[in-house]
Amino acid sequence: GQEAVLAGSLHAMDLSKDRMITAYRNHVQPIGMGVDPKKVMAELYGKETGTSMGLGGSMHIFSKEHRFYGGHGIVGGQIPLGAGIAFGDKYHGSDAVTLCYFGDGAARQGSLHETFNLAMLWKLPVVFICENNGYAEATATDWHLNTKNLPHKHSNSINLFNHESSKIQ
């Protein structure tokens, strides 16, 4: 059910240089970044021909060649890593952008807010994408989040034309 979010993101990316990092629900993103679907399936089945030689499994699909830096089993663990990838690109003079996906459950992690602060302070080339289904581990987001003042753009992932207005800048 996350394919629409990816489709909009890919439309805004330059696949020859931009990077992506995500959470543990990461089966479709590597394929969108150009990873062979057979390698993704091999990883899911624990085969040596998988993206991580069958050792990463469902949560840890990875392809440096395709600038896909994997899924991560720690809730919100990919958020500071995404900023770190963007910092590296900025430091080395690259104009690549890193897309960092996270779920609404990760929005209550302290590392998210610390990372947002550093990303804004250092003007990092990173776009944080919250895939918000409205419930984080059975808790409505209105009960535990107050993020309305953060700079953001809302995008309906089902409306492909809406993604054009949210194009990465």
PLM features: residue spans?
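A positional/architectural concept
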Residues: 126-128
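Cofactor-binding active-site loop characterized by glycine-rich and histidine/acidic residues
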Residues: 2-122, 140-146, 151, 155
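Thiamine diphosphate
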Residues: 130-169
